[in-house]
């Protein structure tokens, strides 16, 4: 049996008179004037099939999503029936034979992009959801994206190498996904959060340009752009400076934009230091498609009598504001902004609106001098009707509050713009909530100054960089430490004693002793890049079989219990309190 000679969109007016065989699904069926019209859909698109039910009686049995094979003759559509919204809208197939390859149960939802479907239902029947046109387009775009990446890196002389997925646990910021060993009971593998150490080992091994489209795993809390398992482009190069990395990654991202959006990005991406990004946009992944930048107001209020502002400055804090433009602002809306600022970490928020007569409408206006009021209008470039939002607190709090409000209230001029950006010069270390020190990127990142890292680690700057697109962090990279002595110093600053460092990383520290070349690299999420380029709000719409935000697969019902026999083979016993909690939850 021949299932097809053509796919749907292979057919056009140049094929009129040809006999063709196509296979696919019944997307739509309607009867008109004693003739049946069937829209047959395959992976390429739709083609209309015309059949006479009296001649081909099986047509009466066709229902939505039946899988069928049609043989017939390609004909031009009659005048007045051409459909310019279909690629095949000028032709139709006059059927000689229709074969039902597989019937379909009644559908749980319409496979129509116009239908609003609860996401959990979509994931429960993901195999049906993937037939919807926009989901099919997303998968096709993702395939083209990875193809463009591979072609670009191949042209640049990179070697594609696979690294292990059963590795030793070396936590990199999130919890590891652990895999118990049957042969060495009580021991565990980890699934890689990234191929970080193995790609560095490849540099030590003389593979000067490496890349991999790698599956990675992180047991972390979910957001719209997070999954337990994800795909990233991972690359590394020997004898590279930061500039070498950025230029290479730009070439890859430009190829991706050209492939998916048909856009040529010719100019170098803008660059901001981490400090500049936080000062101007209140974010280390700023969306630069619109302005609304944060403005420093400290000097304007250095002699203020307004206690909130003077108290912030006396306490070593800062006063900053943003102009969110002309908009209606009722008291309820103003209260909503204050509540939102508190959610973001502020104790409060000052809001001011420039009235039609040029005066300032605000609960705090009476506490501000004439010079302070006119200075605000000038500094924030305010016009009639504009709303000004001002925060006074520690620098970190003010930045995250105004940065969050900026994203809530700002809108890009167009959703089609691709605003790529590099953020460089990240702090080497961060402070945890409990006061302990942790790494900003990962502990294998090289500092700009080794001396400063040792003498004043909280002020040390790393050779790390992030790529940002439309406010979404695509990925990050760094120049790596290639001196084992420096690597040990970093561990020491992080509070990792020598014994712990040897136990967890001794094998890697030894490798660094064998003529390690200077090297650096980068990794970015394929899922996130595909999401932004396709204009989706969630990476779940560009992943074939994703998990929900609670880490569940509604289709297979993973994660699930396993047989007691399997647990015994692994030397694992589920604690009684876990079993009790599961039973109480009805699981």
Predicted segments, located by residue:
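Class II aminoacyl-tRNA synthetase catalytic cores and aaRS-like
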Residues: 1-587
């Amino acid at each position: 049996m021949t299932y097809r000679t053509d796919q749907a969109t292979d057919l056009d007016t140049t094929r009129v008179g040809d006999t063709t065989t196509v296979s696919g699904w019944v997307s739509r069926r309607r009867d008109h004037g004693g003739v049946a019209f069937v829209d047959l859909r395959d992976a390429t698109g739709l083609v209309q099939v015309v059949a006479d039910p009296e001649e081909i009686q099986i047509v009466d049995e066709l229902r939505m999503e039946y899988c069928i094979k049609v043989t017939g003759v390609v004909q031009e559509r009659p005048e007045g029936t051409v459909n310019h919204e279909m690629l095949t809208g000028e032709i139709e197939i006059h059927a000689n034979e229709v074969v039902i390859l597989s019937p379909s149960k009644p559908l749980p939802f319409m496979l129509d992009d116009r239908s609003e479907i609860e996401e959990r239902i979509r994931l429960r029947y993901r195999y049906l959801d993937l037939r919807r046109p926009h989901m099919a387009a997303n998968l096709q775009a993702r395939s083209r994206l990875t193809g463009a990446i591979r072609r670009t890196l191949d042209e640049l002389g990179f070697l594609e190498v696979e690294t292990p997925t059963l590795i030793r646990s070396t936590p990199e910021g999130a919890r590891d996904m652990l895999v118990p060993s049957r042969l060495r009971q009580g021991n565990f593998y980890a699934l890689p959060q990234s191929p970080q150490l193995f790609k560095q080992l490849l540099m030590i091994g003389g593979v000067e340009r490496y890349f991999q489209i790698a599956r990675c795993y992180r047991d972390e809390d979910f957001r719209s752009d997070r999954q337990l398992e994800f795909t990233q482009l991972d690359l590394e190069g020997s004898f590279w400076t930061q500039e070498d990395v950025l230029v290479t990654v730009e070439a890859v991202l430009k190829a991706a934009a050209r492939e998916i959006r048909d856009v040529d990005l010719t100019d170098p991406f803008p660059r901001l230091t981490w400090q500049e990004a936080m000062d101007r946009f209140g974010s280390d992944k700023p969306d630069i498609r619109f302005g609304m930048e944060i403005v420093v107001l400290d000097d304007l209020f250095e002699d203020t009598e307004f206690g909130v502002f003077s108290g912030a400055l006396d306490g070593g804090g800062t006063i900053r504001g943003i102009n969110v433009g002309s908009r209606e602002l009722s008291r309820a809306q103003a209260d909503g902004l204050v509540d939102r600022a508190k959610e973001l970490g502020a104790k409060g928020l000052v809001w001011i609106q420039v009235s039609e007569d040029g005066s300032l409408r605000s609960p705090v206006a009476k506490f501000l001098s004439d010079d302070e009021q006119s200075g605000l209008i000038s500094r924030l470039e305010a016009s009639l009707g504009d709303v000004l939002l001002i925060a006074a607190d520690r620098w970190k709090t003010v930045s995250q509050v105004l940065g969050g409000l900026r994203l809530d209230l700002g809108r890009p001029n167009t959703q089609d713009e691709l605003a790529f950006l590099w953020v460089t010069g990240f702090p080497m270390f961060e402070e945890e909530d409990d006061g302990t020190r942790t790494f900003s990127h990962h502990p294998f990142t090289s500092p700009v100054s080794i001396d400063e890292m040792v003498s004043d680690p909280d002020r040390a700057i790393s050779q790390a960089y992030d790529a940002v697109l439309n406010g979404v962090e695509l990925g990050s990279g760094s120049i790596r430490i290639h001196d084992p002595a420096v690597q040990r110093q970093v561990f020491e600053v992080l509070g990792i004693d020598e014994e712990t460092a040897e136990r967890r990383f001794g094998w890697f520290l030894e490798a660094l002793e064998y003529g390690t070349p200077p090297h650096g690299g980068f990794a970015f999420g394929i899922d996130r890049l595909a999401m932004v380029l396709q204009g989706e709000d969630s990476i779940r719409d560009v992943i074939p079989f994703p998990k929900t935000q609670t880490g569940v697969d509604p289709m297979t019902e993973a994660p699930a219990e396993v047989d007691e026999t399997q647990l015994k083979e692994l030397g694992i016993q589920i604690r009684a309190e876990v079993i009790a909690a599961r039973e109480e939850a009805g699981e």
